[in-house]
Amino acid sequence: PSALARFNPDGSLEVWLPNQAPDMFRTDIAKRTGLDPAQITVHSPLLGGFFGRHFLYDSASPYPQAIALAKAVGRPVKLIWSREEEFLRDVLRPVAAVHFRGALGNDGWPVAIEAISATEGPTEAIAGKQGEKLDPSALEGLAGKSYAIANKRIAQRYVKGPAMLGYWRSVGNSLNDFFYESFLDELADKGGKDPFELRLHLLRDNPRLTTLL
């Protein structure tokens, strides 16, 4: 992570920083400096990848330090964090424990599935959600599956974790798909089915996905 800050002779401020939401960052910089947003220019370098990393996380960006240093020394400051500092201060992926239950018909095919995720989700970290803490992104990979299972229940139980979370690439899918597919393998074993044949059966009305398989 890096940032460059420069105060101009007219009192305006220019900041160069990788980001996914320039207006959001400019508003935050205005709060930190007391400047009018019209005095602040945020330059968004067209380089690298974002992958959910460059949002407005509380401790995971060096631009507040670059601005403070530029103001203190009266000259432009470019700040680059070491890899050690980046990993110490950065956000993490969502973490969850998911409890699954399922039911099989007399023919061994799944007829019901329940997945309850004990997790926080990253939306609270970026948006400061108040009151309602449920986060749809935390259930990605559990909800919205194409498998033709007649009875489904997908739920989140809010559990606050010790670390600040962020929207790293694929968010909920990065863990929940593994959980869900592993449980399907268990259902296949319990029902005496081949895991591949079970998936073909559950996707039998979806030619696109059966072709993909």
Please state what every model-predicted region is.
Residues 77-100:
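Structured beta-strand/loop patches that form or line metal/cofactor-binding pockets in enzymes
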Residues 47, 84-86, 120, 205:
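Residue-level marker for beta-strand->alpha-helix junctions and adjacent short loops that shape enzyme
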Residues 75-81, 110-112, 195-199:
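Acidic/polar loop patches that form or flank catalytic/metal-binding clefts of enzymes
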Residues 30, 57, 93-94, 150:
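Short, glycine/charged-enriched secondary-structure capping and boundary segments
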Residues 24, 86-89, 120-124:
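Short, well-ordered, mixed-charge alpha-helical segments that flank or form enzyme active sites
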Residues 1-3, 95-182:
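Glycine-rich loop/linker segments at domain edges
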